[in-house]
Structures are given as C-alpha cells and as structure tokens.
Amino acid sequence: RHSDPARRGELSVCDSISEWVTAANKKTAVDMSGATVTVLEKVPVSKGQLKQYFYETKCNPMGYMKEGCRGIEKRYWNSQCRTTQSYVRAFTMDSKKKVGWRFIRIDTSCVCTL
C-alpha cells in the first residue's frame, strides 16, 4: 500500500470506507438545530444547476471492528469502532418548504472509543 518502507505494515486502529454520495441517495439529513431537512439534488448556479455530492467516511462493517479496535488489549479495555459525524454546508429544504444553505451532519470518520 505504501511506497515508504518505514510505513509498510501500518494498519488503522479501525477500518473505514469512503465514498461520494449524491443528494439523490441521501434524501434527508439532520441540521444544526436537530431538525430533519430534505437534501436537494441540485444547486442553482448562474448557468443552470449542479448536482450536490458529499464525501462520506464510515466504519467498514466487513472490517476488523467486530472484535474491538485493532491494537487495543481486549483483556483490559472494552473498545469499539464508531462512525462519527461532522457538519457540512448543503442546499436543503426544511419542513416549512424554506429552501437555503444549512449545515447538515454527515458521516466523516471511523474512530476507536474505549
């Protein structure tokens, strides 16, 4: 995986997968106030519309995480890989049909919790 010989054999504590997700696949999200909003597929720009994409990272369900975090001593620690979220700007519509830019939560990493 790595071209640097010093880094060969390095593994993450938790396995993750990352992918581009379209607003068509996302449909809804939670905004900063905790409200569920509709994620709009297209964003209006001066020359038409652009599709909305989000780069999401989450824990890999097929990875090592079933037995806890890699490298954590199971006899002494109860560990778990968990997907965490961050806020990103998205073009959305709220329950009152108000359209605009809001911060929504998306999956952004896989971390080890003890």
From Swiss-Prot:
Gene Ontology molecular function: growth factor activity; nerve growth factor receptor binding
InterPro entries: Brain-der_neurotrophic_factor (IPR020430), Cystine-knot_cytokine (IPR029034), Nerve_growth_factor-like (IPR020408), Nerve_growth_factor-rel (IPR002072), Nerve_growth_factor_CS (IPR019846)
PROSITE patterns, per the entry: NGF_1, NGF_2
Compartments, record wording: Secreted
Keyword Secreted: yes
Function: Promotes the survival of neuronal populations that are all located either in the central nervous system or directly connected to it.
Cellular component GO terms, alphabetical: axon; cytoplasm; dendrite; extracellular space; perinuclear region of cytoplasm; synaptic vesicle
The family this protein is said to belong to: Belongs to the NGF-beta family.
Disulfide bond sites: 14-81, 59-110, 69-112
Keyword DNA-binding: no
PANTHER family assigned: BRAIN-DERIVED NEUROTROPHIC FACTOR, NERVE GROWTH FACTOR NGF -RELATED
GO BP of this protein: cell surface receptor protein tyrosine kinase signaling pathway; modulation of chemical synaptic transmission; negative regulation of neuron apoptotic process; nerve development; nerve growth factor signaling pathway; neuron projection morphogenesis
Keywords, sorted A to Z: Disulfide bond, Growth factor, Secreted
Protein name (record): Neurotrophic factor BDNF precursor form
Signal peptide: none
